[in-house]
Amino acid sequence: ISLGLVGSEMCIRDRHCAVHQSTRGKDQGSISKITLTCSGGPFYNLPKNKFKEITIQRALKHPIWQMGKKITIDSSTLMNKALEIIEAKYLFNIDSEKIDTIIHPEGLVHSFVEFSDGTILASMANPDMKIPISYGLGFPKSISSVSKKIDLQTLKKLTFHKINRRKFPSIDFAYFALNHGRGMPI
């Protein structure tokens, strides 16, 4: 789907669509940082020394999303987030040092875009793939979505946590691949 990014197509992923919506019409040079969020998966609160007890059935129970088996396992290990970091670098033509990721257990904020003036735009929506799909299909217009809207009046909290990279080394794999040349991410 052509969205006027670096290439002629855009990956229809919730995080990348969220970034695109926040950066659309903005000067690319004014972007200081892109932050992609993740729920932390089913093992966010599990100590690393308990990882050996993880079963496939447990790994397939994502706390937010209902997905296929492979992407659910990739999400459980944060490998999916590592792939999204690599994709963001090429989709938005941004240095890897300007891409960050953070755990957001509620799954309502999909990305943050920080600009050089200190402004940060957050893209929020309920976790539902109908939203980025309708965005891609309707671009540049917005299509009314059948997805449940967030009621800000009843929203109690939004929490964010730094990713423990010793527990989830896939994030470091992404940066290693990006910093070692264009072919390395393949």
Annotate each language-model stretch with its function:
Residues 18-22, 33, 84-91, 136, ...:
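Alpha-helical scaffold segments in soluble metabolic enzymes
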Residues 1-7, 11-12:
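Single conserved hydrophobic/aromatic residue that forms the stacking wall/gate
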Residues 92-186:
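C-terminal substrate-binding/catalytic lobe of Rossmann-fold NAD(P)-dependent dehydrogenases
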Residues 13-15, 22-23, 34-40, 75-76, ...:
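Fold-independent oxyanion-binding glycine-rich loops
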Residues 29, 80-83, 132, 169:
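Charged, alpha-helix-enriched surfaces in structured cytosolic catalytic cores
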